[in-house]
């Protein structure tokens, strides 16, 4: 697997399109940090670290729906392994005029675009969520 973040985002997107309540993805610290931001922003109900069927660590993500529709309408990977996207604090994109969120990996940790602006740090823009 070349891009674990893109894999996790695709699993979430596909599971929501199928109406699943949970999705399981392999565990990593970066994935957990991204999920922390998604949970804090209200895009997922939460997640829990489990042991997968193969004995490897995994993460079970509880997806969130509102009136039967997925809360996440759009989930896009911005920085990719072949083309990293780094932005200063003033260049971090505003998603859908502030209705969405950019998830940024900064020297102070993985955080939302608003938190990065508050902390006055830039970094690698991992993905956008709306």
Curated annotation (Swiss-Prot):
It holds the Pfam family Ribosomal_S8. Keywords: Ribonucleoprotein, Ribosomal protein, RNA-binding, rRNA-binding. One of its GO terms (cellular component) is ribosome. InterPro entries: Ribosomal_uS8, Ribosomal_uS8_CS, Ribosomal_uS8_sf. GO terms for molecular function: rRNA binding; structural constituent of ribosome. GO terms for biological process: translation. One of the primary rRNA binding proteins, it binds directly to 16S rRNA central domain where it helps coordinate assembly of the platform of the 30S subunit. HAMAP family: Ribosomal_uS8_B. Belongs to the universal ribosomal protein uS8 family. Part of the 30S ribosomal subunit. Contacts proteins S5 and S12. This is Small ribosomal subunit protein uS8.
């Amino acid at each position: 697997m070349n891009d674990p973040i893109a894999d996790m985002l695709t699993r979430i997107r596909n599971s929501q399109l199928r109406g699943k309540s949970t999705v399981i993805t392999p565990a990593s610290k970066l994935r957990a940090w991204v999920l922390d931001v998604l949970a804090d922003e209200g895009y997922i109900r939460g997640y829990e670290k489990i042991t997968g069927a193969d004995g490897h660590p995994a993460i079970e993500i509880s997806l969130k729906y509102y009136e039967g529709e997925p809360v996440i309408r759009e989930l896009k990977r911005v920085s990719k392994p072949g083309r990293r996207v780094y932005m200063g604090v003033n260049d971090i994109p505003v998603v859908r005029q502030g209705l969405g969120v950019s998830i940024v990996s900064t020297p102070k940790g993985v955080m939302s675009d608003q938190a990065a602006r508050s902390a006055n740090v830039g970094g690698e823009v991992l993905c956008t969520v709306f």
